[in-house]
Amino acid sequence: MAVQQVKKSRSKRDMRRSHDSLTNPTLSTDKSTGELHLRHHVSPNGFYKGRKVVDTKSED
C-alpha cells in the first residue's frame, strides 16, 4: 500500500475539497405555459424561449 512522504496539511486538504460542493439546479419559468424547466433546456411540452421547437405527441 502506498504511503505518503509528507503529510498534507489541513489547509491543502481543504483547498482541494473547495470544489466538491453541490449546487441545486437552476429552474426557469416558461413564458408561454408557466411551467418550470431547466435553464437552456426544452420544456417537456416542446417549448424553448416561448417558441414551439419540438413536436410532441397529442393525447387522443
Curated annotation (Swiss-Prot):
Family, as annotated: Belongs to the bacterial ribosomal protein bL32 family.
Superkingdom assignment: Bacteria
Protein name (database record): Large ribosomal subunit protein bL32
Biased composition (Basic residues): 7-16
Record-level GO BP terms: translation
One Pfam short name: Ribosomal_L32p
One GO CC term on file: large ribosomal subunit
Lineage of the organism: Bacteria, Pseudomonadati, Pseudomonadota, Gammaproteobacteria, Thiotrichales
UniProt keywords, alphabetically: Ribonucleoprotein, Ribosomal protein
InterPro entries: Ribosomal_bL32, Ribosomal_bL32_bact, Ribosomal_zn-bd
Residue ranges, annotated region (Disordered): 1-60
Native organism: Francisella tularensis subsp. holarctica (strain LVS)
